[in-house]
Amino acid sequence: MIYGTGIDITDLKRVQRVVERQPRFLTKVLTPNERVDYQKLSGQRALEFIAGRWSAKESYSKAMGTGIGATVTFQDIEIRDNDAGRPVVRRQPFGGIAHVSISHTETVVMTQVILERGNESW
């Protein structure tokens, strides 16, 4: 059963400006494991990565119905790629399954998270 769904669209230039002006942004948004993944990237791909993770975590918080804040923080959610390169929510406060999709164009990133409960044995 679907518990919640969240969608976010983020402008890449906006994220680039934030990263350039606020170096702590990376530490705030990315978990230590995600920062290791980020440091392997450069240029446009690095920007897409940080924007994608930020947007996906925003989508997750919307699916929870809380937004990012006291109930759910960026550090509560960890998204890593599986062996095939698909993003997977590895750590999260929701007790069910979290599905994530991240898509990019040259200028924006769009993410969707669906939280599912009751089919954990699938």
From Swiss-Prot:
One of its GO terms (biological process) is fatty acid biosynthetic process. GO terms for cellular component: cytoplasm. Mg(2+) binds at residues 8, 58. Its cofactor is Mg(2+). It comes from the Bacteria. It is an enzyme of class 2 (transferase). This is Holo-[acyl-carrier-protein] synthase. The gene is acpS.
